[in-house]
Amino acid sequence: DTIPCGESCVWIPCISSILGCSCKDKVCYHN
């Protein structure tokens, strides 16, 4: 499933990547 992490990654990487989120289509999604 692609659950939004409530974070965008247009200018900076996903800070929520430490929680297992990754950037996709300029939005951070949970893996």
UniProtKB/Swiss-Prot annotation:
Pfam families (alphabetical): Cyclotide
PTM summary: Contains 3 disulfide bonds.
Tissues and organs where the protein is expressed, per its UniProt entry: Expressed in seed but not in root nodules.
Keywords: Disulfide bond, Knottin, Plant defense
Cross-link Cyclopeptide (Asp-Asn) residue location(s): D1-N31
Disulfide bond among keywords: yes
GO biological process per UniProt: defense response
Disulfide bonds: C5-C21, C9-C23, C14-C28
Purpose: Probably participates in a plant defense mechanism. Not active against Gram-negative bacterium E.coli ATCC 700926 or Gram-positive bacterium S.aureus ATCC 12600 up to a concentration of 100 uM under low-salt conditions.
Recorded domain comment: The presence of a 'disulfide through disulfide knot' structurally defines this protein as a knottin.
UniProt similarity note: Belongs to the cyclotide family. Bracelet subfamily.
Protein name: Cliotide T14
